[in-house]
A protein has these predicted regions:
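Short, solvent-exposed loop/turn elements at beta->coil junctions and helix N-caps
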Residues: 66, 96, 184-185
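Cofactor-binding loop segments of dinucleotide-utilizing enzymes, especially the Rossmann-like FAD-
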Residues: 66, 115, 278
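Polybasic, low-complexity association/targeting segments
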Residues: 62-69
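Phosphate-binding/catalytic loop of phosphoryl-transfer enzymes
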Residues: 69-166
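ATP-binding/phosphotransfer module of carbohydrate and carboxylate kinases, centering on a glycine-rich
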Residues: 1-60, 79, 83, 102-109, ...
């Protein structure tokens, strides 16, 4: 039978699923993250070989990865081809993976909110527009790393309640010098910053159990407001340009820039938003608050990880 292997690779881990021609999931597993920007060919081949001792060789391999730019595609393609000499290999970025997982072959605005953040306007086949996310130093509004950054700023500058600072230092077992060192001297500061988010999520859940006027609820509310602010910036800095573009007339577009194609009106103007990632999953309430209540943009779907959606997408693609 024809097998398809789907790999979804983030910076921390790679999820794998082997599916049959009927769309049944034969096997799932995960292995460490594969990022062509940070890893050598040998490293990547090692990861692929270690884990993928498959009983059945796939006929097709679909690889979706963070750090897979157009320039990186040929390299990733050849590494996968070495690992699966018999298979037809397709390599795509994680943004198209998210769009396919969320919307299949329908149009929509697809977003990733995990350690980093990204978004695109998707027409059901291709990414039509992609606001550059710029990473956690220059951008990545609403991401885990940026929320961690805002949190540390708040506890050390004193704009968040002092009780939160005490609780976080106890929870993490870290002190001020160690934190500064992790952010400025050690590698992978973005992962360290994002690792604060489970604590933030826990504090909000805890606070909601307490009555009005309690310190716990006060702490939770201050964190909730911090998250709302970051999601608001994610919306304004990234999504507004897609919403404007879709609503713009052909005349408006031609004035904007030469060579920019107008949005296909048959796809509709009121697109729904879709989100993939742990931050969207854990902070669904403030996310819906900003997108739906504030800006009247409907969220169609929030997926913690894209794999289920990718399996559905590739099961529908016959042959």
């Amino acid at each position: 039978s024809k097998m398809k292997l789907i790999a979804d690779s983030g910076s921390t881990k790679t999820d794998l699923a082997l599916i049959s021609d009927q769309g049944d999931v034969v096997m799932t597993c995960n292995t460490q993250g594969i990022n062509p920007i940070h890893q050598s060919d040998a490293d990547i081949l090692q990861i692929l070989c270690d884990k993928l001792v498959l009983n059945e060789q796939p006929q097709e391999v679909f690889f979706y990865g963070s750090g897979v730019t157009e320039a990186m595609k040929p390299r990733m393609q050849s590494l996968l081809q070495q690992s699966f000499p018999e298979a037809k290999v397709e390599v795509q970025g994680d943004m198209l993976g998210a769009a396919r997982a969320l919307f299949g072959d329908k149009p929509g605005i697809a977003c990733i909110l995990g350690t980093g953040a990204n978004s695109c306007l998707y027409d059901g086949k291709n990414i039509v527009m992609n606001t550059p996310p710029l990473g956690y130093i220059l951008g990545d509004e609403g991401s885990g790393a940026v929320l961690g950054k805002l949190f540390l700023n708040g506890i050390f500058k004193g704009t968040l309640p002092v009780s939160l600072k005490e609780k976080y230092l106890a929870w993490s077992g870290l002190d001020y010098p160690t934190i500064i060192n992790k952010v400025y001297k050690e590698p992978l500061a973005n992962r360290f910053l994002a690792s604060i988010c489970p604590f933030i999520s826990q504090q909000i859940a805890e606070g909601e159990k307490h009555e009005n006027g309690s310190d716990e609820l006060n702490d939770a509310m201050s964190l909730y407001r911090m998250i709302l602010g970051s999601f608001e910036l994610f919306y304004r800095n990234n999504l507004v340009s897609y919403i404007d573009y879709v609503k713009a007339s052909v005349e408006d577009i031609s004035r904007l820039a030469s060579g920019v194609k107008a949005w296909d009106a048959s796809l509709g103007e009121n697109l729904e938003l879709g989100f993939v990632g742990s931050i969207a999953h854990y902070f669904e309430s403030p996310l819906r608050n900003v997108m739906e209540d504030e800006h009247h943009q409907k969220i169609a779907l929030i997926l913690r990880a894209p794999m289920k959606g990718l399996v559905a997408f590739h099961s529908r693609q016959r042959g």
